[in-house]
Amino acid sequence: VTRFVDFNLKLAVIEELMYGESPKLTPWSLADTLNAKGFDGDLWQYSADNYWDQVMPEAQAHFETLELSAELLEGIEQLIFDGGCQVYVECCPHWDGEGEQFDVASLDDLHLLPNLERVLGAELLAPQLQADLRARGITLVD
């Protein structure tokens, strides 16, 4: 079982694997999940009213328990940090891409991504995290 220390870094990996240019996993939909449970309201409003600064529980549960094989992780060559990433929409539909809700706090999981070559949107990472990535030879693209 692959465990990530930093949930937000795992979300960036999921973005690449599930919603990126060449998805390797079937995209997951919060709306479809809630609709299957009988929800028929406005998802954006429901999210804003009930989970203002939180990941929706269904998304948290799904993404936390999502198994990512070593083979999938070895295929990751880039990560994208952008407030408009689909994984964030699935986690928190009303999120406007601003704020610290999805900031990566730790790179302790980088050993899980042995072929990571570049990080897009690196300016959104803390300076120390940027320095750590550079020290590992990873190209940062703002």
Where are these regions (language model features)?
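Leucine-rich solenoid repeat scaffolds
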Residues: 114-142
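LRR N-terminal entry segment and analogous cap-like coil->beta motifs
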Residues: 5-10, 14, 18-124
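N-terminal low-complexity, Pro/Thr/Ser-rich intrinsically disordered segments
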Residues: 1-2
